[in-house]
Design a protein with these regions (language model features):
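Surface-exposed aromatic
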Residues: 99, 144, 171
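Solvent-exposed loop/turn segments at secondary-structure junctions
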Residues: 91, 108-109, 150, 178-181
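Surface-exposed, charged secondary-structure patches
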Residues: 104, 112-158, 208-209
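Classical Sec-dependent N-terminal signal peptides that target proteins to the secretory pathway
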Residues: 2-22
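Short beta-strand edge/turn micro-motifs at domain boundaries
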Residues: 156-184
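Alpha-helical propensity feature that highlights long, continuous alpha-helices across diverse contexts
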Residues: 21-30, 50-54, 124-125, 129-139
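Early exported N-terminus immediately downstream of N-terminal targeting peptides
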Residues: 24-118
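Low-complexity, intrinsically disordered terminal/linker segments enriched in charged
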Residues: 173-209
Length: 209
């Protein structure tokens, strides 16, 4: 059940990324106003324009999509902050090397969950995404609402993107109907660590290619 929920949430995140752009070429997030909602729009525009360019060259293969994902999506996610949330109280028990091991595992998990979906998308015209100008900001974190809808349909869904700011605003989670990707990751890691112990989990992650 958790895997189904996680896949559903990541699909929503993915759809938001893929269909948010209105025009290409995009403007770099570094060149626009430093507010959460404008940064979200600029981030998504940059990503989607890159995928449009990829598909215009008829190069939407799994390999090319994977490379573009690593280059254009992952850099906009604050993996360290996401991993800290996913590990909750376990985070403070880890040294710097062990934290990087879990960060790498989370990155791999996110890529594996949506890369095949990214590679299979061919129809770019039927989904609209609206980024709300209003946002909630608290110190160095923010929440921005996205509304997704189908063309020629009254159906829509709203999701909340969560961002954290260090040197720039980056995504760290997505929430839909009070369920978030990182809360599901937290449940998964907590269950695994309680069964195996944190040292064994780290050892197993180190053995992964």
């Amino acid at each position: 059940m958790l895997n189904i929920l996680k896949a559903f949430l990541i699909n929503l995140w993915l759809i938001g990324i893929i269909f948010a752009a209105e025009s290409c070429p995009s403007i770099s997030p570094k060149m626009v106003e430093d507010t959460p909602s404008i940064q979200v729009k600029a981030i998504f525009d940059d990503i989607v324009c890159s995928f449009i360019d990829l598909h215009s060259k008829s190069d939407g293969t799994l390999s090319s999509t994977l490379n573009l994902t690593k280059k254009k999506i992952i850099p906009y996610i604050d993996l360290e902050y996401s991993t800290q949330l996913a590990l909750s109280s376990y985070w403070d028990q880890l040294d710097a090397r062990e934290r990087k091991v879990f960060e790498r595992d989370l990155k791999s998990s996110l890529i594996e969950d949506y890369i095949s979906i990214l590679a299979s998308i061919n129809n770019w015209e039927n989904i609209n995404v609206s980024v709300s100008d209003e946002y909630f900001e608290n110190e160095n974190t923010a929440r921005v609402k996205l509304t997704l809808s189908l063309k020629n349909s009254n159906e829509s869904a709203s999701v909340v993107l969560k961002l954290v700011r260090r040197d720039m605003w980056k995504l760290y989670d997505l929430e839909y109907q009070s369920i978030s990707i990182m809360s599901i990751e937290e449940i998964g890691y907590d269950s695994k660590i309680k069964r195996q112990g944190i040292d064994r989990v780290v050892d197993n992650l180190l053995k992964k290619p």
